[in-house]
A protein has these predicted regions:
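A structural signal for well-ordered alpha-helices, especially hydrophobic packing surfaces
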Residues: 56-59, 327, 349, 353-356, ...
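Generic structural signal for well-ordered, non-transmembrane alpha-helical segments
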Residues: 49, 53, 155-158, 198, ...
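Extended amphipathic alpha-helical segments enriched in small hydrophobics
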Residues: 307-365
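FAD-binding core of flavoproteins
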Residues: 166-311, 478-524
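Acidic/polar, glycine-rich intrinsically disordered N-terminal extensions of enzymes
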Residues: 9-73
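Alpha-helix capping/hinge segments and adjacent helical runs
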Residues: 376-523
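Glycine-rich flavin
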Residues: 73-214, 221-233, 243
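Short, charged, amphipathic alpha-helical segments
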Residues: 336-343, 371-379
C-alpha cells in the first residue's frame, strides 16, 4: 500500500478519505458470501482482502504529494476533495477530469481494477445534474418531492468520499415473451409507507457490491417490465435483509511476484438479494414509471461509459507496450512482418484516443451546466474497442509465442541448480532474462488466466454489450430517414422532404425533452 502523507496546508480543510479509513468502514456486519464461504470481514478474508486493499490504494493515491494537483481539487468553500467529485463545467475541466481518470488506471495496473470509486460515483452526476424529472416523473410517491433526497445523497457521498456500487441488472427472464419479465424474481416495490418503500427481489449482477459503502439501485428497461420493478435509489450493504452473494473468486492472494495483476484482487461480481428491505424516501430517486426508465438504459450510465472508453485507451497503450517489450526480448521486433503486426496495436490505441479527444472537443452543456463529451463519439468508441479487442488479444499472445505460456516459477528461478539452464532459455538480444519473466507474467495474468478472462468478459458487457451499444446509441440522435441526418443525401439525390414544411416528427423527437437534453445533439434544444 502507499505511504499516506498529509499534503494540505495548515489552514486548508482536507476532506479526502484514506485507505485506512476505507478498510475500517468495511467491517460493518454486511452479509457477504464468496463461493461457499460466509465472509465476516471483507477487509481481512483471503478471498477479498486483496481487492479491498487495492481500493484502499485508490484512496491513498489522493494523498501522494506528487499527485495532489491531479488527484484532488479545491472546491468553492476551499475544501480539498477527491477529483471523484469534480463537476467539470468547461472543456478544460473535462480534460482535467480525464487526466485524473487516466492516472487512477495507470497507477492501479493499467486496467486491472476497472470499477474504482471514481467510476462508480461518476454515475450519480446524471441525477444531480437534472434531478427534477426523476421526481416529477415518479409514480407512487403520493406527491413527495424526491429532489431533496437526490441532492442530499450526493452531498453525503462527497463529504464522506464514499463508494456507491451500481446494481442495475435484473435476472434473465424468458426473453421469448415480454410477459415473463413481470413474473421474474427481479427487485420490486411490495409496499409503501410514510417511512419509505419496502422492496423484495434480486439484482442479478452488481460488480464490487461487497466492497461498497452504498449500493446504488437502478434498472435497465426491458419490454414487459412492470411499474413495481422501476426502482432507483440507494441502500447500505449492511441494511437488514440485504445479502450479497459473490461468485467464486479468481484472486491469487499473496502471490504478488508470480501473479502481479491477479494478486491485486477480484472485483467479485455478485447477486444481491433483498428480503423486505426498507428504503427511506430520502434515498429513493425514482419509482414506478416504465416510460421514464425506457429513456435511461444508456443515459444514466453515460459518465461510466465515457470512463470505460478512457480505460480502454489506457489498456490499449498497455497492450502496445507489452507487444513492443516481448518482441524486443525474443528478438523478433526488427522483422518487418512483426513490425506490421505491432502497428495494429498502435492503430488501435490511436483510434481509441481519437474517439476520446473528439468526444471531448465536440462536447456540450447539460441542463445543470456540466460539460459533457459527445455521446455518439464515446459510445461508438466503446463499440470499436469491443469489436477489436479479442482479435488483438490473440495477436499479442501469438507475438509472444511460448514466452506467454512456458516459463519458470520464481521458486524454480531461485534454485541455483536450475538457474543457469532457465536463464539461458530466457536470454534474448536485449534485456535481462528475469525481465522476460516479468513481462510474461503480466501477459499471462491479463490475457491467459481465469482472472484475466473475467475482466475481458466484464469489458464486453460493461454497461451494455455490443448489440445494445449500437441499438441504444442510434436512439440518442436524429437517425430517422425523415430526419436531418439524411438531408445531405436528399439534396444530392434531388429528393424533397416527404414531411413538407416544418419539423418532421421522428422517433427521436418523440422522446421527452428532458431526456434528449442529455444527448447534446443540435436539435435537442428546440
Amino acid at each position: 500500500m502507499f505511504l499516506v502523507v498529509q499534503i494540505s496546508c495548515p489552514r486548508e480543510e482536507h476532506d479526502v478519505r484514506t485507505g485506512k479509513e476505507y478498510l475500517a468502514a468495511l467491517n460493518d456486519g454486511r452479509t457477504v458470501w464468496v463461493g461457499d464461504e460466509l465472509v465476516a470481514d471483507v477487509s481481512t478474508h483471503p478471498k477479498t482482502r486483496a481487492y479491498a486493499r487495492s481500493i484502499a490504494d485508490f484512496y491513498d493515491l489522493h494523498h501522494r504529494p506528487d499527485l495532489q494537483d491531479v488527484m484532488t481539487f479545491l472546491d468553492e468553500d476551499g475544501v480539498r476533495r477527491s477529483m471523484t467529485w469534480f463537476q467539470h463545467r468547461s472543456k478544460e475541466d473535462l480534460l482535467r477530469k480525464r487526466r485524473y481518470l487516466e492516472t487512477v488506471q495507470r497507477e492501479l495496473g493499467g486496467g486491472a481494477i476497472p470499477r474504482t470509486p471514481d467510476v462508480n460515483n461518476y454515475v450519480l452526476l446524471t441525477y444531480v445534474d437534472d434531478p427534477e424529472p426523476w421526481s416529477s416523473q415518479s409514480v407512487g410517491t403520493d406527491g413527495r418531492d424526491l429532489t431533496g433526497g437526490i441532492l442530499d445523497f450526493w452531498n453525503v457521498m462527497r463529504d464522506g468520499d464514499l463508494n456507491a456500487t451500481p446494481a442495475f441488472v435484473d435476472p434473465q427472464a424468458d426473453r421469448s415473451r415480454d410477459s415473463a419479465q413481470a413474473q421474474s424474481p427481479a427487485l420490486r416495490v411490495i409496499a409503501t409507507s410514510d417511512e419509505g418503500i419496502t422492496v423484495r427481489g434480486v439484482k442479478s449482477i452488481s460488480t464490487g457490491a461487497a466492497f461498497g459503502d452504498w449500493i446504488h439501485i437502478g434498472v435497465f428497461y426491458r419490454p414487459g417490465i412492470v411499474a413495481e420493478q422501476i426502482i432507483y435509489g440507494a441502500v447500505k450493504p449492511n441494511t437488514p435483509g440485504v445479502t450479497i452473494i459473490c461468485r467464486e473468486s479468481n484472486v491469487r492472494d499473496g502471490e504478488e511476484v508470480e501473479h502481479p495483476l491477479a494478486s491485486q484482487g477480484d472485483e467479485l461480481d455478485s447477486i444481491i438479494v433483498f428480503e423486505d428491505v426498507l428504503i427511506p424516501w430520502n434515498r429513493v430517486f425514482h419509482i414506478g414509471n416504465p416510460e421514464h426508465a425506457s429513456l435511461y438504459p444508456q443515459r444514466v450510465f453515460d459518465w461510466l461509459h465515457y470512463h470505460s472508453l478512457v480505460r480502454a485507451m489506457v489498456k490499449a497503450e498497455l497492450m502496445l507496450g507489452l507487444a513492443l517489450l516481448i518482441t524486443e526480448h525474443i528478438g523478433t521486433y526488427q522483422l518487418p512482418p512483426v513490425q506490421a503486426r505491432i502497428a495494429r496495436f498502435a492503430g488501435f490505441l490511436q483510434t481509441l484516443k481519437a474517439h476520446v479527444i473528439a468526444s471531448e472537443d465536440d462536447g456540450f452543456f447539460t441542463p445543470g451546466g456540466i460539460y459533457k463529451p459527445n455521446v455518439l463519439m464515446f459510445d461508438f468508441g466503446r463499440a470499436y474497442y469491443i469489436e477489436h479487442i479479442t482479435d488483438l488479444t490473440h495477436e499479442l499472445v501469438d507475438l509472444s509465442g511460448r514466452a506467454a505460456l512456458i516459463y519458470p516459477t520464481e521458486g524454480q528461478w531461485e534454485r541455483p541448480e536450475l538457474r543457469p539452464w532457465l536463464a539461458a532459455l530466457q536470454t534474448g538480444p536485449v534485456g535481462r532474462p528475469h525481465d522476460r519473466l516479468k513481462i510474461s507474467r503480466v501477459i499471462r495474468d491479463m490475457f491467459l488466466s481465469d482472472w484475466g478472462d473475467r475482466i475481458s468478459t466484464f469489458e464486453n458487457f460493461n454497461g451494455t454489450p455490443l448489440l445494445a451499444i449500437r441499438s441504444l446509441t442510434m436512439k440518442r440522435a436524429e437517425m430517422s430517414p425523415t430526419g436531418t441526418m439524411a438531408d445531405l443525401a436528399r439534396k444530392v439525390c434531388g429528393i424533397e422532404s416527404v414531411t413538407g414544411d416544418g419539423e418532421p416528427e421522428t422517433a427521436y423527437l418523440a422522446q421527452a425533452d428532458y431526456a434528449r437534453r442529455q444527448d447534446g445533439t443540435r436539435r435537442n434544444a428546440r
